[in-house]
A protein has these predicted regions:
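N-terminal helical capping/dimerization or prosegment-like subdomains
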Residues: 1-39, 43-47, 265-267
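Buried hydrophobic packing segments
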Residues: 5, 77-87, 177, 208-212
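Active-site metal-coordination/substrate-binding segment of hydrolases
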Residues: 35-102, 108, 120-122
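Histidine/acidic-residue-rich, glycine-tolerant segments that coordinate divalent metal ions
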Residues: 95-202
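Short amphipathic alpha-helices in soluble, non-transmembrane regions
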Residues: 183-185, 280-289
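An extended, acidic, His-containing surface patch that forms the Zn2+-binding/catalytic region
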Residues: 199-206, 210-261, 275-280, 295-340
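A short interface-forming secondary-structure element
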Residues: 267-276
């Protein structure tokens, strides 16, 4: 994807550079001492199941495009490339160079691409990422990822598997049980969505845990899930139902579950309101998990982004958007994490 994007930009007349063995790259137009940055990512979340169209082919029907990455974030990247091409073709004189920076590890949360860019390449004096919602985003919640580990107890649960990534609401989960000396397999289906909007999905791990409640009521895992997670999306049962005026409620998603050696491992994705520190989530989670013999590891803590929605940056973006669209919607805060 990165090779293609850079080749496309070269054909359109941009200056391009491939950075550090395909980790990231950029393409730019214009002249000037400083750079305005457009940060886009070319990686995608796992396709999952239930597609009506080939996930990794671009399909068009009734004026709509279908395929993994069409909206997040390959489609917006292409839109920005051709906006830059229009500026180039129009011969508009720019005070600064405009550079689109392509990354490839946004969805994984590693962001080693942007770390490399920051260390080795020129930093923009201003930037935005076309990776969220209109009209403009002035804040992103704190992103917390946790790994929960507990012994695979002798309560009849032999194996359990579900989910593809912590930042996706899982649409499938299956378990293998031993009941009255006989093995039994059960499955549960759900509806995938992004972990920042778990209300848009249906968590298959939660659905399977509910089924297990009647089959293995003494299982520590089953009791923990029932008592501390359940069907709640906002951390109420865990004791961390945080909220603030600017960014709303905390969201929590059990994204993956599996068995490694003799342990059961879950990954939980939390989007915490912008005014709270990580400990406001981590400490209640650890206390709740300890009651069931579960170890909690904080594997990612990405601080929140918060800008003045009445400041110059947001005001200018809104002015252009409103002039072109006639839409006077207010800027918002999101749960998703981006290159911003």
């Amino acid at each position: 994807a990165l090779d293609y994007a850079l080749e496309l930009c070269r054909r359109l007349g941009f200056e391009t550079k491939l950075c550090d063995k395909h980790r990231c790259g950029w393409a730019q137009i214009g002249a000037g001492e400083t750079v305005v940055g457009i940060l886009a990512h070319l990686d995608v979340v796992p396709a999952g199941s239930g597609w009506s169209y080939p996930a990794y082919d671009l399909s068009e029907e009734n004026g709509r495009l279908y395929g993994r990455g069409v909206s997040d974030d390959k489609g917006p990247a292409i839109a920005c490339i051709y906006a830059m091409k229009d500026i180039l073709d129009a011969g508009i004189s720019l005070k600064r160079r405009v550079r689109i920076i392509f990354g490839q590890s946004e969805e994984s949360g590693e962001w080693d691409d942007m770390a490399y860019y920051r260390e080795h390449e020129e930093l923009p004096v201003f930037g935005f990422t076309p990776d969220a919602d209109f009209p403009a985003i002035y804040g992103e919640k704190r992103l917390l990822n946790y790994k929960l580990t507990m012994p695979l107890e002798e309560s009849g649960l032999l194996d359990i598997r579900g989910g593809s990534a912590s930042n996706v609401v899982p649409d499938h989960c299956e378990a293998r049980l031993l009941i009255d000396g006989r093995e039994k397999c059960i499955t549960a289906s759900g509806k995938a969505s992004h972990a920042s909007t778990p209300e848009d999905g249906e968590n298959a791990i939660a659905a399977l845990a509910e089924k297990l409640a009647s089959l293995l009521p003494q299982s520590p895992f089953v009791r923990f899930y029932r008592d501390r997670i359940g069907s709640s999306l906002n951390g109420e049962l865990m004791g961390c139902a945080l909220a603030d005026i600017e960014s709303g409620k905390l969201t929590m998603n059990v994204g993956t579950i599996g068995v490694t050696d003799v342990n059961l491992v879950m990954e939980i994705d939390v989007r915490s309101p912008v005014t709270f520190e990580a400990d406001a989530v981590t400490e209640p989670l650890r206390r709740a998990a300890a009651e069931y013999g579960i170890e909690v590891e904080l594997t990612q803590d990405t601080p929140p982004v918060y800008m003045d929605k009445n400041g110059d940056v947001i005001r200018r973006l809104l002015a252009v958007y409103r002039e072109e669209t006639g839409d006077f919607s207010e800027p918002t805060v999101i749960g998703g994490g981006t290159y911003a």
